[in-house]
Amino acid sequence: MDPGVSSHLRTASLDEARRLPELERVLKSGWLIKKGHATSTKKQLWAVLRRDQLSFYKDEKEYKTKFIFPTQDISAVAYYKEKSPKTFFLYLNEKIIRLIATSNEDAEEWVHVLRSTTGYRAPFSRHPISYILANSSSRTESEPNVQISDTDFDNISTEPRNQTTSPLDLETGQGDHFCTSLYDLIQFGKLRPPGINEENANYPFNPQEVNTLNKHRHSASLQNLYKLLDENKVLMQGTIHWLHGNLHRWSKCWAVVRGYGMTIYNTNREYKPVKVIPIADIQDVAEINVPESSHKYFFTVITQNKPIEFRVDNEDSLILWVAALKTSIDKANGTFTAC
């Protein structure tokens, strides 16, 4: 075997050996009651949280697992302390799990540990230049397009437009569209242009070959994003639907996300807000997965008192709304700071 290859394999084995103990380390364990959809259905199980998964056993002997939830599948944790101090909810990819702890203090500890371990916290791409899917030549005039810019906020709209994209000039950054550093908030490859398969999306896009990706007119650095948050400038805005009222009806509205929270207006004139959700009142944000065939995309803003559900038109918008809100939460909690 080539000495270089042998050395590489030994290094990889050592890295894996160091990683395994960390994955096996128990972050928290204890009894939890898992409640089903029916009020009478509940099971007391022994729960064990490790870095990569939350496991449930019949008892503390941990002989056989009853349920396993990978931590990467837990997108948010909801805890309504005033209403139900022992109860918290896990938002998973396809369902919501209700859990009841043995005491108020135990519930708070579970929530704290889970939030520090699970869900995505607006990860950043290591690619030196930030890109985003700004537009696609395959769109039609009737399809809405969300334009985002951290400098020309008046240009942000969801109005239909009919423009074609042009190849990007890497030296000047010129192109038909501009995009925000919000791309840095989402897992690399989650947004990708039509025609790019998932395997190719795992690598940085080549802007010379993919004309739908455009360089930001200014640096999309973390410092720039931190400034946007610090000055409460617009991170995301557009037309969405929200579920509200005693009859739980869907209403079309104009929403704006800034560092201090989310504001909802009747129209994009932003004359008078109909609802303001301060960032301090938002626990977390979660995507709600529904069958892909339904062509509907939802996310929930989990406030201190209740969840508020929103609907958007496409998956790209869904990712950006969630990313903008997640980052505002991270800034408020001190998780996200300028590098």
UniProtKB/Swiss-Prot annotation:
Region (Disordered): 141-170
Mutant lacking the gene: phenotype: Leads to off-center septation. Does not affect its3 localization to the cell membrane.
Location(s) in or outside the cell: Cell tip; Cell membrane
GO biological process, one term: mitotic cytokinesis
Signal peptide: none
GO cellular component, one term: cell tip
InterPro entries, A to Z: PH-like_dom_sf (IPR011993), PH_domain (IPR001849), PI-Interact_SigTrans_Reg (IPR051707)
Domain of life: Eukaryota
Polar residues compositional bias, start-end: 141-167
Keywords: Cell membrane, Membrane, Repeat
Major subcellular site: other
Domain PH stretches: 25-119, 233-330
Membrane topology: Peripheral membrane protein
GO MF terms, alphabetically ordered: phosphatidylinositol-3,4-bisphosphate binding; phosphatidylinositol-4,5-bisphosphate binding; phosphatidylinositol-4,5-bisphosphate sensor activity; phospholipid binding
Function per UniProt: Binds phosphatidylinositol 4,5-bisphosphate (PtdIns(4,5)P2/PIP2) at the cell membrane.
Subunit (UniProt): Interacts (via domain PH 1) with phosphatidylinositol 4-phosphate 5-kinase its3; the interaction is direct but opy1 does not appear to regulate its3 localization or function.
Note on domains (UniProt): The PH 1 domain interacts with membranes containing phosphatidylinositol 4,5-bisphosphate (PtdIns(4,5)P2/PIP2).
Stated name of the protein: Pleckstrin homology domain protein opy1
Gene name linked to the record: opy1
